[in-house]
């Protein structure tokens, strides 16, 4: 049973624009999938179909086999946690503690369980000393962690992150990678919508490329990242490690700068050795 399944899904916006056009996509439980593409590609519109914020004009979206047309947003949100690009649009409570507690109360958790879950997530996401602070006073990175903590407090099976690296510095991106790794180790299904291919590359995820509401490609990251023509068509910048690998004639991108350095030094040494023979 797939965690997520889009079957011939199209969505026409109120202004008549076709935001999704014949989307067919199956994502298994425990899988990490990157959804990439330029502005207006349909990435966020696709995410909003996961918890019923939008319903397809045509076709079906199923979450663990259940048609989203047959469930409310509240019912779907219990299984699908969405973290949107702009944290300010997701935060509204007077304190970090009440922000996290809000969703848990809506889902009917006992007060004792709410207290326990709040303690767990604030410790894990580095928010323990901010419980009484107003969310709007937090930094960009702290707000993003709070949004993720708020969603993960009720332990949805699926987490979808919309442009999670926007406005984040290098260290916060590293922390975010650790969060994603932890979720995957627990068997969660994770979708990351992003144009930041450098951030995504260490995961080497299955990558779905979107453009003009359509799926342009669905393949392993190694193949997508070397296809400069596809990336150009999707309005994406080819990662530097992929550009270097392609220039050197490799059939896959380097995993990191250390691998690139070792490979180049090794090739150079090999040329010198052959020259001396």
Question: What residue ranges belong to the model's regions?
Answer:
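Catalytic Walker B motif of ABC-type/P-loop ATPase nucleotide-binding domains
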Residues: 159-162
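Conserved ABC ATPase signature
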Residues: 134-138, 142
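Helix-to-loop junction immediately C-terminal to a conserved catalytic motif
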Residues: 51
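Conserved ABC transporter NBD signature motif
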Residues: 59-67, 76
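The feature captures the beta-strand-to-loop junction immediately N-terminal to the Walker
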Residues: 36-38
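H-loop/switch region of ABC-family ATPase nucleotide-binding domains
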Residues: 194-195
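Conserved ABC ATPase "signature" region
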Residues: 112-130
């Amino acid at each position: 049973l797939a965690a997520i399944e889009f079957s011939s899904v199209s969505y026409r916006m109120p202004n008549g624009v076709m935001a999704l056009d014949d989307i067919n996509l199956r994502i298994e439980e425990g899988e990490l999938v990157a959804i990439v593409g330029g502005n207006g590609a349909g990435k966020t519109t696709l995410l909003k179909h996961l918890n019923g914020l939008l319903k397809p004009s045509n076709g079906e979206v199923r979450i663990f086999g259940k048609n989203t047309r047959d469930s409310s947003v509240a019912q779907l949100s219990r299984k699908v946690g969405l973290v949107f690009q702009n944290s300010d649009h997701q935060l509204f409570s007077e304190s970090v503690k009440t922000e996290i507690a809000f969703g848990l109360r809506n889902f009917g958790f006992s007060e004792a369980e709410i207290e326990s879950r709040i303690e767990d997530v604030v410790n894990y996401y580095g928010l323990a000393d901010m419980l009484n602070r107003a969310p709007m006073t937090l930094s960009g990175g702290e707000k993003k962690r709070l949004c993720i903590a708020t969603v993960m407090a009720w332990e949805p099976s699926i987490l979808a992150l919309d442009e999670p690296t926007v406005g984040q510095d290098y260290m916060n991106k590293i922390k975010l990678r650790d969060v994603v790794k932890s979720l995957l180790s627990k068997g969660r299904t994770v979708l990351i919508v992003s144009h930041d291919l450098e951030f995504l590359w260490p995961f080497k995820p299955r990558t779905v490329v979107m453009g003009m509401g359509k799926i342009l490609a669905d393949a392993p990251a190694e193949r997508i990242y070397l296809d400069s023509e596809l990336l150009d068509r999707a309005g994406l910048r080819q990662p530097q490690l992929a550009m270097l690998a392609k220039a050197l004639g490799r059939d896959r991108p380097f995993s990191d700068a250390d691998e690139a350095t070792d490979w180049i030094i090794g090739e150079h040494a090999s040329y010198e050795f052959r020259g001396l023979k």
